[in-house]
Amino acid sequence: MKFNGEKTKLEIGDYNKIRESVTINPGTKGGGGLTKVGNNCLFMVSSHIAHDCLVEDNVILANNVPLGGHAHIEKNVIIGGNSAVQQFTRVGKFAMIGGMCGVVRDIIPYAMVHGNRSILQGLN
């Protein structure tokens, strides 16, 4: 277990839309103690932001998208429904990830990816 009662933080910016059954975990001592969400994000039904994640501004997580711990989602990223982002993964700005995609490695900025192992399809 990562959390052991330490003082940790969860910062959520302005004008975010957080829908039903969304979960956002605070940071952990071993990960810097902070989970941070930027401004103007949309988290659709049952999406999940794990401990120590950094989600920048204008990010959209469609239904049932879990972010693993320590993930970094840069600004203006769209992640399609039922996709999953593995822990310690970075998704570059303006990237688009198709539905049902397994993101197991970093995604470059402006990329369009889809498939079980997030295959680069082109630039956004």
Give names to the regions the model predicted:
Residues 1-114:
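Structural signal for interior beta-strand "rungs" in well-ordered beta-sheet cores
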